Amino acid sequence: MNKQNNYSDDSIQVLEGLEAVRKRPGMYIGSTDKRGLHHLVYEIVDNSVDEVLNGYGNEIDVTINKDGSISIEDNGRGMPTGIHKSGKPTVEVIFTVLHAGGKFGQGGYKTSGGLHGVGASVVNALSEWLEVEIHRDGSIYHQSFKNGGSPSSGLVKKGKTKKTGTKVTFKPDDTIFKASTSFNFDVLSERLQESAFLLKNLKITLNDLRSGKERQEHYHYEEGIKEFVSYVNEGKEVLHDVATFSGEANGIEVDVAFQYNDQYSESILSFVNNVRTKDGGTHEVGFKTAMTRVFNDYARRINELKTKDKNLDGNDIREGLTAVVSVRIPEELLQFEGQTKSKLGTSEARSAVDSVVADKLPFYLEEKGQLSKSLVKKAIKAQQAREAARKAREDARSGKKNKRKDTLLSGKLTPAQSKNTEKNELYLVEGDSAGGSAKLGRDRKFQAILPLRGKVINTEKARLEDIFKNEEINTIIHTIGAGVGTDFKIEDSNYNRVIIMTDADTDGAHIQVLLLTFFFKYMKPLVQAGRVFIALPPLYKLEKGKGKTKRVEYAWTDEELNKLQKELGKGFTLQRYKGLGEMNPEQLWETTMNPETRTLIRVQVEDEVRSSKRVTTLMGDKVQPRREWIEKHVEFGMQEDQSILDNSEVQVLENDQFDEEEI
């Protein structure tokens, strides 16, 4: 092996100290909520994946232990166990110095995720304790750390071994992760499965040893990203078998897989050296550019587009497309835009992906002539639907004259007095009676009320033209005023927050789900920006005493109710709210609309693949997947209504005091 790829003690480079990590963890892992907690695991897992990516090892085991700690074990080369040029044991350098890793300066890896060299030390800094066990050069080595990264032992040789690899076990520090230090099996599962899809020869096992939660899953996909696309499209009506292309250009390896379904939204998942690039980048641009050019050339060749016709827009060509674009870029070419590393900036990646797709796609279209013709016709229909969407957007923009004027005159929208779109809020309220209370109870300056009277359409099943015909959805589109679908522009929104306020019963929950499905599919940037909320009206009102000694309390959960009952003692009256209309305007303001006292749930998309699959399963045409999901996840009891707070996945933002790291 040449020096370029020699994973040794000298290939570990040190850039800076670790002191700031515990003070500002958000800078290193994004947040200290459940996303940040799970990010710790990904940092260590991605180091193991980098070993596999570079041809060392093929197995990774992740185990949630009984005590709540987690272990990540691989069968790679094992971390270097000698003395680093700085004079300290190399293992200690890797786990205690920020930016110490084999990925800086091409010392140990040809390709890697680029940002994961910081991983081990950051995880150590944010852990109550951490232990590392290394199998290398015939020996087993062990070192432990405690209290956020301080070595509690030196590197100790424990015995002999024929294996190679690294095992890291750590317990997150509950003084850093105050919300929870409990790992979620399903969240880890999605991410680990993703890694297995991207590397054909990688086998991953996920174990949960916690009492009452025992579970095990294995991930190994011999057909790689082809199976990834099938997985994403599960439950959807697909139009053809998955197509795959591979090639190399500019020293960059390119893998592409795609499949069309009968839906109206596109889903492109892009990766660089097995790391997800959520914000896309040059590789995604290359894919889209080549696809648009090749499709238009083909459409003209088969005479579906005439000389006088405009080219098809890329958005129309990609309607209903699911694609995975995976590139492997040498370390010296790897560039990201911004600090988050979620957008690729390597210019060579654009031409590499463009070249591979432009080379392979024309042959595929010629070979599948009948399918290709139907895909072109599908794109032409999408173009027509987009024109309708553009018209709706223009109507909304000129609302002072036309559509919005009609909306206002019809008595639906009660607007806010202020024109400050940075502060204004739109409440979507279930029913007229609650809408009346909300109108009277609101702060007129910045809160607008839109009562929903009719049936909200299920936008997962409906065609785009039918969505525009639905009065409730159409009113929402015009009220928000930022367009819809691919033409949605978040900067044009009339409101900083859209708040869904429904009764605390199954009908109210159904309306919430229908509205969230619409926002997720057709106003996704609004959800991604964290600007869609669910209002949380109380379930109970407790009243005791009269006159000046009268005390009124509200409870949002049964737990809060029990606490208040004990606190108030005997002699109180209890009211169970079944609907928003049972509250007078003052009560509705105080409990649900006043920014000083209300509780809101922010709707967030943490994993787009997972979210999209759930929407398809629960809101799509196919009954069997929905039945199976419900039977697996829903416990049926006598009580029909329960608080959304009973869901452990919900994180509540109270009194509008949003933590910087949660936004």
Curated annotation (Swiss-Prot):
Residues 386-416 are annotated as: Disordered. Mg(2+) 2 binds at residues 503, 505. ATP binds at residues 7, 47, 74, 114-120, 341. One of its GO terms (cellular component) is chromosome. Gene3D superfamilies: 3.30.230.10, 3.40.50.670, Histidine kinase-like ATPase, C-terminal domain. SMART domains: HATPase_c (SM00387), TOP2c (SM00433). Residues 387-398 have a biased composition (Basic and acidic residues). Residues 424-538 form the Toprim domain. Its cofactor is Mg(2+); Mn(2+); Ca(2+). The keyword Nucleus does not apply. Mg(2+) 1 binds at residues 430, 503. It is an enzyme of class 5 (isomerase). It comes from the Bacteria. Keywords: ATP-binding, DNA-binding, Isomerase, Magnesium, Metal-binding, Nucleotide-binding, Topoisomerase. It catalyses: ATP-dependent breakage, passage and rejoining of double-stranded DNA. Its EC number is 5.6.2.2. The record marks 455, 458, 510, 626 as: Interaction with DNA. Binds two Mg(2+) per subunit. The magnesium ions form salt bridges with both the protein and the DNA. Can also accept other divalent metal cations, such as Mn(2+) or Ca(2+). The keyword DNA-binding applies. One of its GO terms (biological process) is chromosome segregation. Heterotetramer composed of ParC and ParE. PANTHER family: DNA GYRASE/TOPOISOMERASE SUBUNIT B, DNA TOPOISOMERASE 4 SUBUNIT B. Topoisomerase IV is essential for chromosome segregation. It relaxes supercoiled DNA. Performs the decatenation events required during the replication of a circular DNA molecule. HAMAP family: ParE_type2 (MF_00939). Belongs to the type II topoisomerase family. ParE type 2 subfamily. This is DNA topoisomerase 4 subunit B.
